[in-house]
From Swiss-Prot:
Region (Disordered) residue spans: 107-136
UniProt membrane topology term: Single-pass membrane protein
Species per Swiss-Prot/TrEMBL record: Mycobacteroides abscessus (strain ATCC 19977 / DSM 44196 / CCUG 20993 / CIP 104536 / JCM 13569 / NCTC 13031 / TMC 1543 / L948)
Stated name of the protein: Sec-independent protein translocase protein TatB
Role this protein plays: Part of the twin-arginine translocation (Tat) system that transports large folded proteins containing a characteristic twin-arginine motif in their signal peptide across membranes. Together with TatC, TatB is part of a receptor directly interacting with Tat signal peptides. TatB may form an oligomeric binding site that transiently accommodates folded Tat precursor proteins before their translocation.
HAMAP family reported for this sequence: TatB
Gene: tatB
The entry's keywords: Cell membrane, Membrane, Protein transport, Translocation, Transmembrane, Transmembrane helix, Transport
Assigned protein family: Belongs to the TatB family.
Keyword match rRNA processing: no
Pfam families, per the entry: TatA_B_E
Amino acid sequence: MFGSVGWGELLVLLIVGLVVLGPERLPGAIRWTTESLRKVRDYASGATASLREELGPEFDDVRKPLAELQKLRGMTPRAVITKHLLDGDDSVFDSLTRPLDDVKKAVTEPAPTPIVNPELAKPAEPGPTRYDADAT
């Protein structure tokens, strides 16, 4: 249930709980939370067991399509093509992506800095400032 929660997140939750509840009420809150989670887990496993008892062999008939749907949920278009059309041979995708890797490398490399020729850039000649009566 909390498989994606790491130690860092648990530490943050503990510190927030310590600040919000205080050191006196925090152990009781942790105890209540663990008991509640245990009750929910027992209730869910009990519901599964009671369904299995009531449905009998039909439970497996219901469970098989759900397991197939679960497998399909994780399928990406690339995985579907590899499995069904290419019989698991993934080398076609490697040959297609190899030229793209060269393009990515060329795009991500910084462009060389242009060399500026100082002889081409001449300052303006001193003299009177030009005045355009139509522009003002």
